[in-house]
């Protein structure tokens, strides 16, 4: 709660990254040190745990709160509804773990309908992976372009279909009257 209050005062973005059991493989951690891989997703719970914070600061225009997780089961069930409801909440793409076309697709498919694309944080960089930043940005852009194009084409198709039904209804109404 204190971190959110301070973020509203200083304008810094608050980020929460639960859902990872770090350094799961003891031998790798012993040989190479901490944070060198072996991060395994674990179950997370946001809705109850963030309720007090979001009631206090979730509608505050001075706060931007980015939520991340490796726990894919929470994308649609908790994260997207929270981001769709609270103006301060943004969804962070779990690219550091699911840095693949399929991983990014699962994230977008499970969150876009409820939270929208505008409620996502975009592509944040991690300086620990400095050499891979360019490749990861390329992957994200190469994936996002067709995703947006397909979404636009699908939405346009729905609009044309709705317009056609409307026009057919008008013709039927005229024929009956």
Locate each region found by the language model.
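C-terminal helical cap
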Residues: 70-76, 91-109, 158-177
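Short acidic/histidine-rich active-site segments
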Residues: 15-19, 66-70, 91-95, 117-136
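Divalent metal-binding pocket/active-site signature
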Residues: 1-74
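A long, glycine-enriched binding/interface module in the latter
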Residues: 53-58, 73-94, 105-119
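Histidine/acidic-residue-rich catalytic or RNA/ligand-binding cores of hydrolases
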Residues: 24-33, 75-83, 101-109, 130-146
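Short acidic (Asp/Glu) and glycine-rich catalytic loops that position anionic groups and cofactors
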Residues: 28-33, 59, 87-90, 120-127, ...
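Mid-to-C-terminal alpha-helical segments outside catalytic/metal-binding sites
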Residues: 117-118, 135-177
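Acidic, glycine-enriched catalytic cores built around paired aspartates
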Residues: 55, 60-63, 69, 79-82, ...
């Amino acid at each position: 709660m204190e971190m959110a209050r301070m973020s509203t005062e200083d304008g810094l973005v608050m980020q929460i990254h639960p859902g990872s059991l770090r350094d799961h493989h003891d031998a790798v951690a012993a040989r190479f040190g901490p944070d060198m891989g072996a991060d395994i997703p674990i179950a997370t719970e946001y809705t109850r745990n963030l309720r007090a914070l979001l009631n206090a600061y979730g509608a505050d225009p001075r706060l931007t709160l980015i939520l991340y997780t490796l726990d894919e089961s929470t994308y649609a069930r908790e994260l997207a509804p929270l981001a769709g409801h609270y103006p301060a909440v943004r969804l962070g793409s779990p690219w550091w773990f699911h840095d693949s076309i399929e991983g990014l697709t699962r994230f977008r498919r499970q969150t876009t309908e409820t939270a929208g694309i505008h409620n996502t944080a975009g592509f944040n960089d991690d300086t620990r992976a400095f050499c891979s930043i360019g490749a990861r940005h390329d992957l994200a852009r190469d994936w996002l372009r067709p995703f947006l194009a397909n979404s636009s084409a699908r939405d346009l198709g729905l609009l044309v279909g709705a317009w056609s039904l409307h026009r057919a209804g008008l013709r039927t109404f005229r024929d009956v009257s």
